[in-house]
Amino acid sequence: NAALENKSIVFYGASMFNSFHPPVRTLMGPGPSDVNPRILEALSRPTVGHLDPAFIDMMDEVKALLQYVFQTKNELTLPVSAPGSAGMETVFTNLLERGDKAIICQNGVFGGRMKENVERCGAEAVMVQDDWGTAVDLNKVEDALKANPDAKLLAFVHAETSTGVRSDAKALCALARQYDCLAVVDAVTSLAGIELKVDEWGIDAIYSGTQKCLSCVPGLSPVSFSERAAQVIRERKTPVQSWFLDLNLVMGYWGGSAKRAYHHTAPVNSLYALHESLVIVQEEGLEQSWQRHASNHRALVAGIESLGLSFVVDAACRLPQLNLVKFPDTIDDAVVRSALLSDYSLEIGSGLGAFAGKVWRIGLMGFASSQTNVYLCLSALGNVLRQQGLDVDPAAAVLAAKQTY
């Protein structure tokens, strides 16, 4: 307090602050997802230098574990030291130069963000538009590829977080290869939640996030590039417009050479957390992780339908880890979500873009994808809807979910 009384030191806050202790929530929205306690413990381990030999060894393990979850042997595989949006920017700023052309598929919010990245690189974005709530149309994509033989890459969102839709990544990558385009995939929500095979499907560049089905803390973005894409980066005619995201520089640190070149101070403790999250996926098994997400999704669907609610997306292209649920016009979206948060400490998401105010986005991602959370969500949502005047039976919804297991 003596320092505050010194007239030469001005404190602009209204009062002295105390340590922040967040409430304990169950996170069943579009992300971030609940963080496994093991990962939180890893985050609190002693910080070491980012060039410490022990840390360098751990970096090599992180790379190998990322290769496992991506199902790739790509040498250029690493976590970008920033959220998934930076992973997206890393891909486009490294692969595109001014005057290039990219075909971008948009069936939700995040295809639009791809377009913005392309144009900020000085490249042309050729858009393939599909209705929100539907998968990317393969025929439209092939028409665009035929009409633009000079396109450098084809980019699409595998699991569109704003709509809960899964597009056919394997078929889209095959089209890209057929027309000699690089295949670029947004896997922010799909990684570890649904089938994803980078090498087998011919994906050239992919980016994800740590805060979805990996159940890690937000702030890192795993990326991977095929040798074909890496060659494009090495042979650029102009420097990458972002110094921080320039992979030609970053790989001096992540490249695995005997001597690591300092590029930036890595987020050491966040990388501990990522390492632990990837170890957890490895322990469970990647296919088992996919199956768990699918199993809990089936249970949630049964319970939601028992409550008389319906889904936006057709079952054939519906994401198991993110569910868009329609609600009656008589229901106040904000009131329901507020009640869930205040009475049950349960977070679900609101609609984005064209779906704002029309749907809930209920996530079952990573550590949050559990039977316990399915039952909690159905019981809590049912109780709140009944308070809002709907004739629903929360217990019957939970029973319907249990019968699917």
Predicted regions: what they are:
Residues V24-S81, S85:
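A glycine-/small-polar-enriched, mobile loop at the entrance of the PLP active site in fold-type I
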Residues G13, A354, K358-Y405:
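PLP-dependent enzyme catalytic core of the Aspartate aminotransferase-like
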